[in-house]
Amino acid sequence: MSAVLSPKLIDGKAAAARVLAEVTEDVRTLKAAGIKPALAVVLVGDDPASQVYVRNKVLRAEECGIRSLEHKLPADTAEADLLALIHSLNADYSVHGILVQLPLPAHIDETRVLQAINPLKDVDGFHAENVGGLSQGRDVLTPCTPAGCLRLLQDSCGDLTGKHAVVIGRSNIVGKPMAALLLKAHCSVSVVHSKSANLRELCRQADIVVAAVGKPRLVDADWLKPGAVVIDVGINRIDEGGRSRLVGDVDFDSALTRAAAITPVPGGVGPMTIAFLMKNTLVAARLQHPATGLPLSTLENPA
């Protein structure tokens, strides 16, 4: 079933629901074999947005049948204490995935913390071993947002072989892993950013545009060739007419006149990020129990 509605709107909520259904089915398969997938979520401090994100992740895990373990630490937690918790979770065979909610308080070294997570339990896909493996085209735990974007593209376009993709943005969380995933899918990939010359002209050549640069409504119809497929990763809060609203990096109404398919903001990429966190937790559990040999739909659909 395609994730494209009308023929233009890519429905991220519907696609995410399908991914979560796959995960739920595979959780049952693993549980029948005595494996109970578990995700540990670590939150340091009381940032309201982070609390909402953690709550949503825990809720989705429970809906899929994944056991969730919340570790809420005060904002003044010492880095050494946080690292000690991570080492404890690494050693706990009943925990298959570890997620440390970002951002961390300023006194904690984010890189040191993320690199302390066992790569096989790194469900965010941020560990250097997973980043390097992805760049080499290996099957590793992959950052959730770009993995979700790839699934939307595959649902919308089918085989991506030979397509020219332009990724706007070079972040370690989205831009770089997105480019690596598209290369693995046999696309020709260009990575552009705010310092790129002829940015608009480069985008006009693309069959696929992934916008992940954090600039509200940067990309409009004039940036697109007719029939392009557009994935908008941007989430920008702006004030418009005295009201606060969320918009993407793409001028949606303008781009809709030229794109063959496009994700909305909200309701496009966002739901896929949490869905792929659940999928990564499932895959992590499977990777930590390779002897089972169980066929799982989440492994048959790796993106």
Curated annotation (Swiss-Prot):
Cited PROSITE patterns: THF_DHG_CYH_1, THF_DHG_CYH_2
GO molecular function: methenyltetrahydrofolate cyclohydrolase activity; methylenetetrahydrofolate dehydrogenase (NADP+) activity
SUPFAM superfamilies in the record: Aminoacid dehydrogenase-like, N-terminal domain, NAD(P)-binding Rossmann-fold domains
Catalysis: reaction(s): (6R)-5,10-methylene-5,6,7,8-tetrahydrofolate + NADP(+) = (6R)-5,10-methenyltetrahydrofolate + NADPH; (6R)-5,10-methenyltetrahydrofolate + H2O = (6R)-10-formyltetrahydrofolate + H(+)
E.C. number: 1.5.1.5, 3.5.4.9
Keyword Hydrolase: yes
One GO term describing the cellular component: cytosol
Positions with a binding annotation for NADP(+): G169, R170, S171, S194, I235
Keyword tags: Amino-acid biosynthesis, Histidine biosynthesis, Hydrolase, Methionine biosynthesis, Multifunctional enzyme, NADP, One-carbon metabolism, Oxidoreductase, Purine biosynthesis
Pathway where it operates: One-carbon metabolism; tetrahydrofolate interconversion
Example of a GO biological process term: L-histidine biosynthetic process
Cleaved signal peptide residues: none
Biological role: Catalyzes the oxidation of 5,10-methylenetetrahydrofolate to 5,10-methenyltetrahydrofolate and then the hydrolysis of 5,10-methenyltetrahydrofolate to 10-formyltetrahydrofolate.
Family membership: Belongs to the tetrahydrofolate dehydrogenase/cyclohydrolase family.
Protein name: Bifunctional protein FolD 2
Source organism of the structure: Ectopseudomonas mendocina (strain ymp)
